[in-house]
Structure formats: C-alpha cells, structure tokens
Amino acid sequence: HWPKLCLNTLRWAKKQGALVGPAHSGWGLSVPGDELPNYNPPPFDGIGANEYIVDVTHTVEGPDGRQVPAVDFLSMVDTPYLWELNIWYHTLNCGFRTRISGETDFPCIYGERVGLGRSYVKLENKLTFDKWCEGIRQGRNYVGDGRSHLIGFQINDIEMGVGDSNVRLDRPGKVT
C-alpha cells in the first residue's frame, strides 16, 4: 500500500483476504516535539501513511462478503518512531483498533541490517504464514528490534490480541 494505492487497492486486496497496511508510515507525518501523543498536526506531505488517517475510517468487503476494516496494520520502525506512533495513538484514541507491524526497508532507508523492525506473533501451535498473518490481524503481536521480547505480555490477566484485549478502567488506577 505505497505510496498512493488508496482505498481502491485496499478493497481489491481485502476481497482476497489479504492483511494490509501502509509502508514507510512516518514520512510526511513529522511533528515538532517529543511527547506522545501530541496535538501538533503533521503536514501530510510525504510518501508515508498520509492516506491511513482516512482509510482507517472505512470498512470494505472481505472474502466472505462481510465488512472488514480497510486497514489491518500500520508499519513501524523504519521511519522516526515519534511520527509513526503519534498518528497510531490518535487513531486508537478515536476507537480504531489498527494493529502495528514491523518493517524494514533494507537497504533503501537503513543499511544497518535486514530485520530492523520485526513482528513477533504469539502462536499456539506450529508456525505457518497464514497463522502468523492472522496473529497480526488479531493483535497477538508486538513490534521490536530483536533486542527485547514481550511475547507473554498481559495487563490485569488480559492477553494481547485475545478477545478485544482492551483494558477499561472506571477511573485512574493501577494495572498489573
């Protein structure tokens, strides 16, 4: 989904059951400051996830004819994290549950190594490509650089990606 393949391409891919999301997410979404989230509007002037902010609000027809989210994930790690996470947090706060997925654009953006941005998916049984993709769609994954691991992460006994995996508090409080 890059750079301007838009909702029409998402419709075409989702009708086939694809897992889809924009690449190079942060380009064009630069914001001043270093707080997350912040209320500084990005310029939307690059090749990144500029269309994501609109596409995430749509549902499209899936392979079985039912409506599914037009965007499954937002790619992370290969552009400045503040720019990527800022737009993701804002869409999460608006109620859209888009997942994140690691991305490496080796050697175009970074020549450091293949696998700079990785998606780790918690699977119950044998690894297959389809199960791995479904794990991202369900949110049973985290993104990392290979140096830290959170595969058993949970809050208040709620595992990531199980059910709606949202933790709701009636008022500010501690989570464990």
How would you name each of these model-derived features?
Residues 2-114:
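Domain-core and long-helix interface of multi-subunit machines
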Residues 10, 15-19, 25-30, 87-176:
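C-terminal functional module detector
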